[in-house]
């Protein structure tokens, strides 16, 4: 299966408490089919103090399942499906709604 969502992509959240928000993918977990998006799905983690770090409540982004995010169309900024096409002998990702190339 080809990677339809990659690190650095602008994505739109389709479901959950952050539905409608947009953000940039900071991490992709392909074995778990999950992605981490900056500023989305922020959770509080209670951490124990160690010799080097102070303990307390830390806010961090939790992962979201890939079915709940869609790549934002480079032209309109709306959610779109991703297709593939060869351009100059290279395989590139293309937004299905506008035909715009996603890979730059």
UniProtKB/Swiss-Prot annotation:
Lineage: Bacteria, Pseudomonadati, Pseudomonadota, Alphaproteobacteria, Maricaulales
Listed SUPFAM superfamilies: Translation proteins SH3-like domain (SSF50104)
Name of this chain's protein: Large ribosomal subunit protein uL24
SUBUNIT field: Part of the 50S ribosomal subunit.
Assigned GO CC terms: ribonucleoprotein complex; ribosome
Organism (species): Maricaulis maris (strain MCS10) (Caulobacter maris)
Keyword hit for Transmembrane: no
Entry function: One of two assembly initiator proteins, it binds directly to the 5'-end of the 23S rRNA, where it nucleates assembly of the 50S subunit. One of the proteins that surrounds the polypeptide exit tunnel on the outside of the subunit.
Gene Ontology MF terms in the entry: rRNA binding; structural constituent of ribosome
Gene Ontology biological process terms from the UniProt entry: translation
Keywords: Ribonucleoprotein, Ribosomal protein, RNA-binding, rRNA-binding
Entry similarity comment: Belongs to the universal ribosomal protein uL24 family.
């Amino acid at each position: 299966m080809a990677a339809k969502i990659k690190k650095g992509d602008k994505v739109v959240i389709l479901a959950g408490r952050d539905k409608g928000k947009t953000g940039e993918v900071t991490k992709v977990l392909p074995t778990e089919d999950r992605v981490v998006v900056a500023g989305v799905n922020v959770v509080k983690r209670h951490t124990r103090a160690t010799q080097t770090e102070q303990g307390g409540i830390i806010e961090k982004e939790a992962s979201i399942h890939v079915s709940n995010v869609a790549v934002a169309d480079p032209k309109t900024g709306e959610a779109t499906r991703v297709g593939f096409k060869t351009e100059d002998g290279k395989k590139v990702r293309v937004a299905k709604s506008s035909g715009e190339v996603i890979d730059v």
